Amino acid sequence: MGNDTIANMITSIRNANLGKIKTVQVPATNITRNIAKILFQEGFIDNFIDNKQNTKDILILNLKYQGKKKKSYITTLRRISKPGLRIYSNHKEIPKVLGGMGIVILSTSRGIMTDREARQKKIGGELLCYVW
């Protein structure tokens, strides 16, 4: 039984948001790099750094907060498809999150992308997570 790196990344970000922690370290894999890139492009995180410590590749995410109370830009981050229950969708059935305010991150045959990109390119895939 292997580790679910996507669930580990989501849980680390969620826990850091609850504790108002600015940086999060997650194991760097191709999937976590692509998810971090999407979160950065959509404005949910400030930036991310691909760091190599000893023999481990680590991805350092700088989370984004607003105001003096440090309200997080990421309200909810939830895993959809899990290793025990994969959930796939074609481009017509990809769910809209909060009427388009949030995003769904998908793994497609053309890489990891947001729901808007997948609808535009008319391709479906595995629904990885919701972000809003």
Swiss-Prot record:
InterPro entries: Ribosomal_uS8, Ribosomal_uS8_CS, Ribosomal_uS8_sf. PROSITE patterns: RIBOSOMAL_S8. One of its GO terms (cellular component) is chloroplast. One of its GO terms (molecular function) is rRNA binding. Transmembrane segments: none annotated. The keyword Cytoplasm does not apply. Its main location: plastid. One of its GO terms (biological process) is translation. It is found in: Plastid, Chloroplast. Keywords: Chloroplast, Plastid, Ribonucleoprotein, Ribosomal protein, RNA-binding, rRNA-binding. It comes from the Eukaryota. Part of the 30S ribosomal subunit. One of the primary rRNA binding proteins, it binds directly to 16S rRNA central domain where it helps coordinate assembly of the platform of the 30S subunit. HAMAP family: Ribosomal_uS8_B. Belongs to the universal ribosomal protein uS8 family. This is Small ribosomal subunit protein uS8c.
